[in-house]
Swiss-Prot record:
PANTHER family: METHIONYL-TRNA FORMYLTRANSFERASE, METHIONYL-TRNA FORMYLTRANSFERASE, MITOCHONDRIAL. The gene is fmt. InterPro entries: Fmt (IPR005794), Formyl_trans_C (IPR005793), Formyl_trans_C_sf (IPR037022), Formyl_transf_N (IPR002376), Formyl_transf_N_sf (IPR036477), Formyl_transferase-like_C_sf (IPR011034), Met-tRNA-FMT_C (IPR044135), Met-tRNA-FMT_N (IPR041711). Belongs to the Fmt family. Keywords: Protein biosynthesis, Transferase. This is Methionyl-tRNA formyltransferase.
């Protein structure tokens, strides 16, 4: 089987490696190099680097035009495997592949169709997440399901944690999907009446509001890691939060919302919220390195009594 692989995100790196070990990957479609850092030097993404190291043909167009379609056709692919590429494919492009196109999507479809299923699951406080391999259709994430699995999302898990899990645990589902396609299976039709949707995450998500519940604030902090990273002001400094948990309690009910009320060596830095206590587990001052709550407290012994804004 001649596979054409499309991805622009390192979440797909492990799948690309394993698919390349087991199948003939004839080409990789990825995003063009992007300016990065203060010098705005062009940065090559991990998918492109891996493909080049394996001597796989790489296409990194800005637009999927007729020239790109012609280049893909010359590779004579049987099937396209898509995992976090970042663009919508036209039918003309999908029609290139005789065996069709499959897509790895990190949710239990039809739940969370769209670009941010992992972040949205954590933001909503879900305790179960999933991975789906679907046949691609013109309507976003609406294709027949070929393989699916679920996993537990723990209270303190961040999006970064789940990205790593999905990256390491998607290949076996891809194998299952490819096996079914070879046997002529068409997959399970999604129930569109059960579909829910998610949108792009952006920098507007990162500022915290301590008037929300501890559960909601914890979810936002964990959802925003690795990007855009939740934050709040403390005195004149910006504090960036990387991981949190919460306690539902009436303790400290007389304290101001957003106030750092205590430090517990076994739990975290305790912050009063609208209905309980937020536990800060990993954080940093802007411009400093990320540390756990014990190291942060040891370097900032005057924290207790200060109020986030």
């Amino acid at each position: 089987m001649r596979i054409f692989f499309a991805s622009s995100d390192s979440i797909a790196l492990e799948v690309l490696r394993k698919v390349s070990d087991h199948y003939n990957v004839v080409g990789v479609l990825t995003a063009p190099d992007k300016p990065s850092g203060r010098g705005l030097f062009l940065k090559v993404n991990d998918i492109k680097v891996e493909a080049i190291n394996r001597n796989i043909t790489v296409l990194d167009p800005v637009v999927l035009n007729s020239d790109v379609i012609g280049m893909v056709k010359k590779l004579k692919p049987d099937l396209m495997l898509v995992f976090s590429y970042g663009k919508i494919f036209r039918q003309e492009f999908l029609d290139i592949f005789p065996m069709g196109c499959i897509n790895v999507h990190p949710s239990l479809l039809p739940k969370y169709r769209g670009p941010s299923p992992i972040q949205t699951a954590i933001l909503n406080g879900d305790t179960i997440g999933g991975i789906t391999v679907q046949k691609m259709a013109l309507e976003m994430d609406s294709g027949n399901i070929l393989a699916q699995s679920q996993f537990e999302i723990k209270s303190f898990n961040t999006s970064a944690d789940i990205f790593r899990y999905v990256s390491l645990n998607s290949f076996n589902l891809v194998l299952e999907a490819l096996s079914k396609l070879n046997k002529g299976h068409i997959g399970i039709v999604q129930d569109s009446n059960q579909a829910t949707y998610c949108s792009f995450f952006n920098k507007q998500h990162r500022m915290l509001n301590f008037n929300l519940s501890a559960f909601e604030i914890k979810n936002k902090i964990n959802a925003c890691n690795p990007w855009p990273l939740a934050r709040a002001k403390l005195d004149k400094d910006e504090i960036i939060f990387h991981r949190a948990d919460f306690i539902k309690t009436t303790d400290y009910s007389d304290q101001a919302i957003g106030k750092i009320v205590s430090f517990d060596p076994s739990k975290g830095i305790l912050v009063k919220t609208e209905d309980g206590i937020l536990l800060l587990l990993e954080l940093q001052r802007s411009g400093r390195k990320v540390v756990d709550y014990k190291s942060f407290y040891n370097g900032n012994r005057d924290l207790i009594g200060k109020i986030f804004s």
